[in-house]
Design a protein with these regions (language model features):
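Active-site clefts of carbohydrate-active enzymes
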Residues: 2-37, 69-70
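Solvent-exposed loop/turn segments at secondary-structure junctions
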Residues: 21-25, 56-59, 157
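Structural recognition of the beta-strand scaffold that forms the well-ordered cores
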Residues: 14-19, 43, 49-53, 152-153
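Aromatic/acidic polysaccharide-binding cleft in carbohydrate-active enzymes
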Residues: 33-88, 101-112
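C-terminal beta-strand-rich structural cap/linker in extracellular carbohydrate-active enzymes
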Residues: 192-214
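Carbohydrate-binding surface patches
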Residues: 112-172, 206
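A structural motif corresponding to the C-terminal end of an alpha-helix
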Residues: 3-13, 45-47, 82-94
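Solvent-exposed beta-hairpin/edge-strand motifs
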Residues: 168-185
């Protein structure tokens, strides 16, 4: 995805990603969290379009298990409801991201000092409770057509949720709003754990949240 992002931004070309939502060859049937991870990682890296493989289960010997969004019998599989939930989020975030240009990407892995990796982003620091697992995040930074910065924070683990404490890089006179994944509207930042220091922003396994700063 890094090389795709570099080339798409260099040539001002829209990048699309095409990924599995069914078992295929040596690839196992993805969970909803794994599909969500593929979708959000694509968005963090600046993708402007996404395609599922496959919408309707193909025929032939290569796909004996079936299992696409629509089965060979024409009935909806459980992937249909998964794609519907993910697509709702995509519709909300897409309204903002289609008006954004990717400016930076940071990957925070276990052992990193987040504040050092996030200097070019709209996030100043990410901290964790001492009982939580080490950091594992993707952070995409964008320039919105309004002049504001957009930041997408993603949990890079698809097997565990995350509960980070996030400090944004907010300059005097600016504020942070979140894009509601249900409605696409700008909503005030909400601290999920007011009894803890800082602002806690939980993330689903493979999940992401989108913010505007300005």
């Amino acid at each position: 995805m890094a090389s795709v992002r570099i080339n798409s931004t260099s040539y001002s070309a829209a990048a699309w990603n095409f990924f599995n939502i069914m078992p295929y060859g040596p690839h196992t049937d993805p969970t909803e969290a794994q599909v969500r991870w593929q979708v959000n990682a694509s968005l963090v890296y600046g993708a402007k379009g996404l395609l599922y493989f496959c919408y309707f289960t193909p025929g032939g010997d290569e796909f004996p298990k079936g299992g696409a969004i629509i089965g060979q019998d024409g009935l909806k599989t459980y992937h249909y409801a998964q794609a519907k939930r993910i697509n709702k989020m995509l519709q909300s975030y897409g309204k903002v991201l289609m008006d954004c240009t990717s400016t930076d990407i940071a990957q925070i892995i276990p052992g990193d000092t987040p504040s050092e990796k996030l200097r070019q982003s709209g996030i100043r620091d990410i901290k964790r409770d001492r009982v939580d697992p080490p950091h594992d995040y993707l952070v995409g930074t964008f320039r919105h057509k309004s002049g504001r910065r957009a930041v997408m924070l993603m949990n890079n683990r698809f097997a565990y949720s995350a509960w980070p404490t996030v400090e944004f890089d907010v300059r005097p006179g600016q504020r942070v709003v979140e894009i509601d994944p249900e409605t696409g509207r700008e909503v005030p930042l909400h601290d999920a754990s007011p009894l803890m220091d800082g602002v806690q922003l939980p993330l689903l396994d493979g999940g992401a949240r989108l913010f505007l700063i300005g």
